[in-house]
Amino acid sequence: MDQRKGSGSDANGGLAEATASRLRFEDPDEVMEENPAAAAATVGAEEEGGEGGGGEEVIGSDKTSADYYFDSYSHFGIHEEMLKDVVRTKSYQNVITQNSFLFKDKIVLDVGAGTGILSLFCAKAGAKHVYAIECSQMADMAKEIVKTNGYSNVITVIKGKVEEIELPVPKVDVIISEWMGYFLLFENMLNTVLYARDKWLADGGVVLPDKASLHLTAIEDAEYKEDKIEFWNNVYGFDMRCIKKQAMMEPLVDTVDANQIVTNCQLLKTMDISKMTPGDASFTVPFKLVAERNDYIHALVAYFNVSFTKCHKMMGFSTGPRSKATHWKQTVLYLEDVLTICEGETITGSMTVTPNKKNPRDIDIKLCYALSGHRCQVSRTQHYKMR
């Protein structure tokens, strides 16, 4: 996985219409609101647009991939980036504060609590007690933050892996977590939320967020593909094309300009966090992208939306290129071919997503695509590895 040099993670960017499930994604101070029943009815027809489990790869003699994962969340910088992501943090804050009926006098479990910001929001909304689980060294800071802000009697920070700790209570009423990674599923924290759900969530309990969806579109990106991929053809007069193949397999995480979008935005996969199983995070789905103008296509771009459907009114946010930028940005999958496409022509194919066998926090992606157009005919399969 790569990132553009100099690309920022701030949430500056124009608001625009997001096109998932016909939901209205708003400015983070308002958050998305819509009729949940109506939105659910459109999902099937739509074509628009930190802790881990077992099986960790051993790295070196005494550290697993999980150890490195948790170590990364011990650094302040990553938490600063997430807290400064206004779309992310304000959306969660608004969901909690504007729907206090979900939290008032309830037992809440915060999975992957980090600095404890979501736990603090829940406590302020009237939660009876919040159990904040955090495996990294940030748990020590979270305890101090909770104490400093006067919530030690409401929030209990527990340091450890969700799969290894025991709660002082048999069941909780609410599980809240910000588990999403790049490409929605990178880092595989979702399985930890599902483990907590199955072990501790009471009958009639709520998981927040409870819906997530993955989307795909196609873009023109000649300039950066030239800089990132074609660069290896001639490096100061030397042929380094052996690296080019590896560079093609590494998805790029970056903010895509909405003007680069050439096709519609296609819903790939919808996940119901309250009902799904860990196996549902591995899937093969078809797609059909229709060109909205004559142009070249250099890459496909994936992004995700999340929804909180148990609120008074449905709320959520999008990480799409037509929405305000987030620290998740978008995931760019460069194509070996440059596709010359005319308005109305279609790229058809399928995407297979699976956790890596050696390290389930990583993702393997298989992309099959075909275009049979007036100016371009191509059919190809490519493999990508998010590491």
From Swiss-Prot:
S-adenosyl-L-methionine binds at residues 79, 88, 112, 134, 163. It catalyses: L-arginyl-[protein] + S-adenosyl-L-methionine = N(omega)-methyl-L-arginyl-[protein] + S-adenosyl-L-homocysteine + H(+); L-arginyl-[protein] + 2 S-adenosyl-L-methionine = N(omega),N(omega)-dimethyl-L-arginyl-[protein] + 2 S-adenosyl-L-homocysteine + 2 H(+). GO terms for molecular function: histone methyltransferase activity; protein-arginine N-methyltransferase activity; protein-arginine omega-N asymmetric methyltransferase activity; protein-arginine omega-N monomethyltransferase activity. Keywords: Methyltransferase, Nucleus, S-adenosyl-L-methionine, Transferase. Residues 66-387 form the SAM-dependent MTase PRMT-type domain. One of its GO terms (cellular component) is nucleus. It is found in: Nucleus. One of its GO terms (biological process) is methylation. The active site is at residues 178, 187. InterPro entries: Arg_MeTrfase (IPR025799), Methyltransf_25 (IPR041698), PRMT_dom (IPR055135), SAM-dependent_MTases_sf (IPR029063). CDD domains: AdoMet_MTases (cd02440). This is Protein arginine N-methyltransferase 1. It comes from Oryza sativa subsp. japonica (Rice). The gene is PRMT1.
